[in-house]
Amino acid sequence: DVYKRQDQTIFTALKQVLQELNFEYCPIDVELTESCLIENDELALSVIQQFSQLGAQVHLDDFGTGYSSLSQLARFPIDAIKLDQVFVRDIHKQPVSQSLVRAIVAVAQALNLQVIAEGVESAKEDAFLTKNGINERQGFLFAKPMPAVAFERWYKRYLKRA
């Protein structure tokens, strides 16, 4: 929403909050879609640079389903690509998806980008992704969306297991 409105106040407010809390780094990951990069590349570059200057990580969301262009990966200073769930779903049974994921991981590694898999729902999907170098995964296999209070309880239990 900030991106679409070209609202610069978010950067000032975020910087102020980080200073007030004495954070040494910004614990926020910002996600932009591929279409954001296409719609207004100058604005996208400015937004990415401003968030990066605050220490936020910038992720390219739903990678591979929009206007994918490898040139975007080289042009925009992002930190991670989020592999869309269409590649993840039943990947252990889909040879084409397996090949595409391996290729995407290879490109990301060559560009020093992190890869995050979205939509992981089964242990078999998780095993394939882990085996192929994707160390961050999201999806119902790990937790479903939940209210903040429920998340706090879940997180405390998670820390006890870790």
What kind of feature is each model-predicted range?
Residues 10-16, 43-46, 95-102:
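Charged helix-capping and loop-helix junction motifs
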Residues 2-3:
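Short, small-residue-biased leader/transition segments that mark boundaries at the very start
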Residues 7-8, 86:
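Cytochrome P450 core scaffold surrounding the K-helix E-X-X-R motif
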Residues 78, 96-97, 156, 160:
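Residue-level marker of structural boundaries
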Residues 15-91, 107, 111-145:
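The catalytic core of metal-dependent phosphodiesterases that act on cyclic dinucleotides
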Residues 130, 146-162:
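C-terminal helical cap(s) of enzyme catalytic domains, especially alpha/beta-barrels
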Residues 6-7, 39:
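Switch/connector loops and helix/strand junctions flanking conserved nucleotide-binding motifs
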